Amino acid sequence: MDVKDRVAIVTGGGGGIGSAVARRWMAGGARAVVVVDRNGDAARAVGTEIGCLGVELDVTNEAEVAALVERVEGEIGPVDIFFSNAGAGAGGGVEASNEAWQAQWELHVMAHVYAARAVLPSMVARGDGYLVHTASAAGLLAAVGSAPYSVTKAACIKLAETIAIAHGDDGIGVSVLCPQGVNTAMAPRQLGDGGTDGIVEPDYVAEVVTAAIRDGRFLILPHPEVQTYVERKAADPDRWLKGMRRLRARSLDLQEGS
Protein backbone atom coordinates (compact mmCIF):
# COMPACT_ATOMS: atom_id res chain seq x y z
CA MET A 1 0.00 0.00 0.00
CA ASP A 2 1.25 3.46 -0.93
CA VAL A 3 0.67 6.08 1.77
CA LYS A 4 -0.26 8.75 -0.77
CA ASP A 5 -3.79 10.07 -0.21
CA ARG A 6 -4.30 7.64 2.68
CA VAL A 7 -5.71 8.27 6.16
CA ALA A 8 -3.60 6.78 8.94
CA ILE A 9 -3.65 6.54 12.72
CA VAL A 10 -0.29 6.24 14.49
CA THR A 11 -0.20 5.34 18.18
CA GLY A 12 2.84 6.12 20.27
CA GLY A 13 3.14 9.03 17.89
CA GLY A 14 4.42 11.63 20.32
CA GLY A 15 8.06 10.67 19.75
CA GLY A 16 10.47 8.02 18.55
CA ILE A 17 9.36 5.68 15.78
CA GLY A 18 5.78 6.92 15.86
CA SER A 19 6.54 10.58 15.26
CA ALA A 20 9.13 9.70 12.60
CA VAL A 21 6.56 7.59 10.75
CA ALA A 22 3.92 10.32 11.02
CA ARG A 23 6.31 12.87 9.51
CA ARG A 24 7.42 10.45 6.78
CA TRP A 25 3.88 9.59 5.74
CA MET A 26 2.76 13.21 5.55
CA ALA A 27 5.87 14.02 3.53
CA GLY A 28 4.93 11.09 1.29
CA GLY A 29 1.53 12.59 0.49
CA ALA A 30 -0.77 11.02 3.05
CA ARG A 31 -4.15 12.71 3.28
CA ALA A 32 -3.99 12.77 7.07
CA VAL A 33 -2.04 11.12 9.87
CA VAL A 34 -3.76 11.19 13.25
CA VAL A 35 -1.08 11.27 15.94
CA VAL A 36 -2.02 9.43 19.13
CA ASP A 37 -0.09 9.28 22.39
CA ARG A 38 -0.83 8.95 26.10
CA ASN A 39 1.17 12.19 26.40
CA GLY A 40 -1.36 14.59 24.94
CA ASP A 41 1.05 17.51 24.71
CA ALA A 42 3.51 15.41 22.70
CA ALA A 43 0.76 14.14 20.38
CA ARG A 44 -0.57 17.64 19.78
CA ALA A 45 2.93 19.03 19.19
CA VAL A 46 3.67 16.47 16.48
CA GLY A 47 0.17 16.91 15.04
CA THR A 48 0.63 20.68 14.82
CA GLU A 49 4.05 20.23 13.22
CA ILE A 50 2.68 18.08 10.39
CA GLY A 51 -0.67 19.83 10.11
CA CYS A 52 -2.76 16.99 11.48
CA LEU A 53 -4.81 16.02 14.50
CA GLY A 54 -2.99 15.10 17.73
CA VAL A 55 -4.95 13.14 20.32
CA GLU A 56 -4.30 12.06 23.90
CA LEU A 57 -5.44 8.46 24.26
CA ASP A 58 -4.88 5.31 26.30
CA VAL A 59 -4.48 2.50 23.77
CA THR A 60 -5.33 -0.07 26.46
CA ASN A 61 -8.82 1.42 26.79
CA GLU A 62 -10.96 -0.21 24.11
CA ALA A 63 -13.75 2.37 24.36
CA GLU A 64 -11.29 5.21 23.73
CA VAL A 65 -9.81 3.44 20.71
CA ALA A 66 -13.25 2.73 19.22
CA ALA A 67 -14.34 6.33 19.81
CA LEU A 68 -11.22 7.65 18.09
CA VAL A 69 -11.76 5.51 15.00
CA GLU A 70 -15.41 6.61 14.85
CA ARG A 71 -14.32 10.24 15.14
CA VAL A 72 -11.67 9.94 12.43
CA GLU A 73 -14.04 8.18 10.05
CA GLY A 74 -16.69 10.84 10.67
CA GLU A 75 -14.44 13.90 10.41
CA ILE A 76 -11.72 12.82 7.97
CA GLY A 77 -12.60 9.56 6.25
CA PRO A 78 -12.10 5.80 6.45
CA VAL A 79 -8.94 4.67 8.21
CA ASP A 80 -6.64 3.11 5.61
CA ILE A 81 -3.65 2.37 7.85
CA PHE A 82 -3.54 1.74 11.59
CA PHE A 83 0.03 1.75 12.91
CA SER A 84 -0.32 0.22 16.38
CA ASN A 85 3.03 1.32 17.71
CA ALA A 86 2.70 2.23 21.41
CA GLY A 87 4.85 0.19 23.76
CA ALA A 88 7.04 0.28 26.85
CA GLY A 89 9.84 -1.74 28.38
CA ALA A 90 9.71 -3.85 31.52
CA GLY A 91 12.42 -5.79 33.29
CA GLY A 92 12.38 -8.93 35.39
CA GLY A 93 11.59 -12.59 34.92
CA VAL A 94 8.78 -14.79 36.16
CA GLU A 95 9.21 -13.11 39.55
CA ALA A 96 7.95 -9.80 38.13
CA SER A 97 4.66 -8.77 39.67
CA ASN A 98 1.31 -9.81 38.25
CA GLU A 99 0.64 -6.12 37.71
CA ALA A 100 3.79 -5.76 35.59
CA TRP A 101 2.90 -8.79 33.48
CA GLN A 102 -0.69 -7.61 33.01
CA ALA A 103 0.37 -4.09 32.06
CA GLN A 104 2.68 -5.45 29.37
CA TRP A 105 -0.05 -7.79 28.11
CA GLU A 106 -2.55 -4.96 27.83
CA LEU A 107 -0.10 -2.69 26.03
CA HIS A 108 1.61 -5.16 23.70
CA VAL A 109 -1.29 -7.50 22.90
CA MET A 110 -4.73 -6.19 23.80
CA ALA A 111 -4.03 -2.71 22.41
CA HIS A 112 -3.49 -4.35 19.01
CA VAL A 113 -6.66 -6.41 19.46
CA TYR A 114 -8.65 -3.25 20.24
CA ALA A 115 -7.24 -1.48 17.18
CA ALA A 116 -8.08 -4.41 14.92
CA ARG A 117 -11.61 -4.67 16.28
CA ALA A 118 -12.15 -0.98 15.63
CA VAL A 119 -10.92 -0.79 12.04
CA LEU A 120 -11.26 -4.26 10.52
CA PRO A 121 -15.03 -4.26 9.87
CA SER A 122 -14.81 -1.14 7.71
CA MET A 123 -11.60 -2.28 6.04
CA VAL A 124 -13.02 -5.69 5.19
CA ALA A 125 -16.20 -4.12 3.84
CA ARG A 126 -14.09 -1.91 1.53
CA GLY A 127 -11.69 -4.73 0.68
CA ASP A 128 -8.77 -2.46 1.52
CA GLY A 129 -6.74 -1.59 4.61
CA TYR A 130 -3.45 -2.09 6.39
CA LEU A 131 -2.44 -2.91 9.98
CA VAL A 132 1.09 -2.48 11.28
CA HIS A 133 2.10 -3.75 14.72
CA THR A 134 5.30 -2.71 16.46
CA ALA A 135 6.75 -5.77 18.16
CA SER A 136 10.49 -6.30 18.68
CA ALA A 137 13.37 -8.56 17.78
CA ALA A 138 12.91 -9.67 21.39
CA GLY A 139 9.63 -11.26 20.32
CA LEU A 140 11.35 -13.30 17.63
CA LEU A 141 14.33 -14.19 19.79
CA ALA A 142 14.40 -13.22 23.48
CA ALA A 143 15.45 -10.36 25.73
CA VAL A 144 17.84 -11.11 28.56
CA GLY A 145 16.37 -9.84 31.83
CA SER A 146 13.04 -8.73 30.39
CA ALA A 147 10.58 -11.62 30.33
CA PRO A 148 7.30 -9.65 30.39
CA TYR A 149 8.51 -7.57 27.46
CA SER A 150 9.78 -10.37 25.22
CA VAL A 151 6.89 -12.73 25.98
CA THR A 152 4.22 -10.15 25.14
CA LYS A 153 6.11 -9.00 22.05
CA ALA A 154 6.13 -12.63 20.88
CA ALA A 155 2.36 -12.71 21.37
CA CYS A 156 2.08 -9.49 19.36
CA ILE A 157 3.79 -11.20 16.43
CA LYS A 158 1.46 -14.20 16.65
CA LEU A 159 -1.55 -11.90 16.69
CA ALA A 160 -0.31 -10.19 13.53
CA GLU A 161 0.17 -13.59 11.88
CA THR A 162 -3.36 -14.62 12.88
CA ILE A 163 -4.89 -11.46 11.40
CA ALA A 164 -2.86 -11.87 8.20
CA ILE A 165 -4.06 -15.46 7.81
CA ALA A 166 -7.68 -14.59 8.55
CA HIS A 167 -7.94 -11.44 6.44
CA GLY A 168 -5.22 -11.55 3.79
CA ASP A 169 -7.79 -12.68 1.23
CA ASP A 170 -10.07 -9.80 2.27
CA GLY A 171 -7.67 -7.19 0.94
CA ILE A 172 -6.11 -6.48 4.33
CA GLY A 173 -2.35 -6.04 4.56
CA VAL A 174 -0.52 -6.79 7.80
CA SER A 175 3.05 -6.09 8.81
CA VAL A 176 4.90 -6.51 12.09
CA LEU A 177 7.90 -4.34 12.95
CA CYS A 178 10.67 -6.14 14.87
CA PRO A 179 13.62 -3.83 15.50
CA GLN A 180 16.52 -4.26 17.84
CA GLY A 181 17.75 -0.99 19.35
CA VAL A 182 16.28 2.31 18.16
CA ASN A 183 17.43 5.72 19.37
CA THR A 184 14.31 6.59 21.35
CA ALA A 185 13.42 7.26 24.98
CA MET A 186 13.21 3.48 25.44
CA ALA A 187 16.78 2.85 24.30
CA PRO A 188 18.45 3.09 27.74
CA ARG A 189 15.98 0.52 29.10
CA GLN A 190 16.29 -2.00 26.27
CA LEU A 191 17.73 -5.10 27.87
CA GLY A 192 19.38 -7.70 25.68
CA ASP A 193 17.49 -6.94 22.46
CA GLY A 194 19.05 -3.68 21.44
CA GLY A 195 22.80 -3.50 21.67
CA THR A 196 24.04 -6.43 19.60
CA ASP A 197 23.85 -4.85 16.17
CA GLY A 198 23.77 -1.16 16.95
CA ILE A 199 21.20 1.54 17.55
CA VAL A 200 19.39 2.91 14.49
CA GLU A 201 17.59 6.22 14.14
CA PRO A 202 13.77 6.53 14.09
CA ASP A 203 13.88 8.23 10.67
CA TYR A 204 15.61 5.16 9.23
CA VAL A 205 12.97 2.89 10.76
CA ALA A 206 10.25 5.09 9.24
CA GLU A 207 11.76 4.60 5.78
CA VAL A 208 11.96 0.83 6.29
CA VAL A 209 8.34 0.67 7.50
CA THR A 210 7.10 2.77 4.57
CA ALA A 211 8.90 0.56 2.06
CA ALA A 212 7.59 -2.61 3.70
CA ILE A 213 3.94 -1.60 3.57
CA ARG A 214 4.40 -0.39 -0.01
CA ASP A 215 5.69 -3.87 -0.89
CA GLY A 216 3.20 -5.70 1.34
CA ARG A 217 5.98 -7.36 3.34
CA PHE A 218 4.89 -9.00 6.60
CA LEU A 219 8.10 -9.04 8.63
CA ILE A 220 9.87 -5.69 8.95
CA LEU A 221 13.48 -5.99 10.15
CA PRO A 222 15.37 -2.69 10.41
CA HIS A 223 18.32 -4.79 11.61
CA PRO A 224 18.79 -7.41 8.82
CA GLU A 225 21.00 -9.50 11.11
CA VAL A 226 17.89 -10.56 13.00
CA GLN A 227 16.87 -12.77 10.07
CA THR A 228 20.10 -14.73 10.46
CA TYR A 229 19.52 -15.17 14.19
CA VAL A 230 15.97 -16.40 13.59
CA GLU A 231 17.23 -18.95 11.07
CA ARG A 232 19.91 -20.17 13.47
CA LYS A 233 17.36 -20.51 16.25
CA ALA A 234 15.03 -22.52 14.00
CA ALA A 235 17.84 -24.75 12.76
CA ASP A 236 19.13 -25.70 16.23
CA PRO A 237 17.02 -24.46 19.17
CA ASP A 238 19.18 -26.19 21.79
CA ARG A 239 22.36 -24.58 20.53
CA TRP A 240 20.59 -21.23 20.40
CA LEU A 241 19.45 -21.58 24.03
CA LYS A 242 23.01 -22.37 25.12
CA GLY A 243 24.18 -19.24 23.35
CA MET A 244 21.51 -17.16 25.07
CA ARG A 245 22.57 -18.54 28.45
CA ARG A 246 26.13 -17.44 27.70
CA LEU A 247 24.82 -14.01 26.74
CA ARG A 248 22.89 -13.83 30.02
CA ALA A 249 25.99 -14.79 31.99
CA ARG A 250 28.05 -12.07 30.28
CA SER A 251 25.29 -9.56 30.96
CA LEU A 252 25.24 -10.46 34.66
CA ASP A 253 29.03 -10.19 34.84
CA LEU A 254 28.89 -6.72 33.33
CA GLN A 255 26.20 -5.65 35.78
CA GLU A 256 28.23 -6.92 38.74
CA GLY A 257 31.33 -5.11 37.49
CA SER A 258 29.62 -1.78 36.97
Regions of interest found by a model, annotated:
Residues V176, G192-Y229:
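C-terminal helical subdomain
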